[in-house]
C-alpha cells in the first residue's frame, strides 16, 4: 500500500540537512548515506549520493526522472548469477 498523500514524502532529517547544505555551498561531493528508505525530492536533483547496498556504496546521480522513487531502488542488494545452463553432451 502506498504512503498517504496527507503525510507527504519521507526523508531522513540528517539526509535533508546534508542536501540543503550541499545545495547552498554548490558542492559536487557525493553524499554518503545508509538511508535507502528516503524519497527522492526535487531539491536533490543534480546531487550524487553514495547509497549503501549492504556491502558497498553505489553511486547514484539524481536526475528529474528519479523524483518520487526511493534511494534504495537505485542500489540493488542482490546479484543475479544466472541459472545453470543446459549441459552439452559429448559424443
Swiss-Prot record:
Keyword field: Ribonucleoprotein, Ribosomal protein, RNA-binding, rRNA-binding
GO molecular function: rRNA binding; structural constituent of ribosome
Biological-process GO terms, alphabetical: ribosomal small subunit assembly; translation
One of the record's GO cellular component terms: cytoplasm
A Pfam family annotated for this UniProt entry: Ribosomal_S19
InterPro entries, A to Z: Ribosomal_uS19, Ribosomal_uS19_bac-type, Ribosomal_uS19_CS, Ribosomal_uS19_SF
Keyword Amino-acid biosynthesis carried by entry: no
Keyword Ribonucleoprotein: yes
Stated role: Protein S19 forms a complex with S13 that binds strongly to the 16S ribosomal RNA.
Homology family: Belongs to the universal ribosomal protein uS19 family.
Name of this chain's protein: Small ribosomal subunit protein uS19
Species in which this protein is naturally found: Sulfurimonas denitrificans (strain ATCC 33889 / DSM 1251)
Taxon lineage: Bacteria, Pseudomonadati, Campylobacterota, Epsilonproteobacteria, Campylobacterales
Gene that encodes it: rpsS
Amino acid at each position: 500500500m502506498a504512503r498517504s498523500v496527507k503525510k507527504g514524502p519521507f526523508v531522513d532529517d540528517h539526509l535533508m540537512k546534508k542536501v540543503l547544505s550541499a545545495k547552498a555551498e554548490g558542492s559536487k561531493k557525493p553524499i554518503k548515506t545508509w538511508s535507502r528508505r528516503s524519497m527522492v525530492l526535487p531539491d536533490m536533483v543534480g546531487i550524487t549520493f553514495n547509497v549503501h547496498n549492504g556491502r558497498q556504496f553505489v553511486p547514484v546521480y539524481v536526475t528529474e526522472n528519479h523524483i518520487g522513487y526511493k534511494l534504495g531502488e537505485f542500489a540493488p542488494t542482490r546479484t543475479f548469477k544466472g541459472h545453470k545452463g543446459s549441459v552439452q553432451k559429448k559424443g
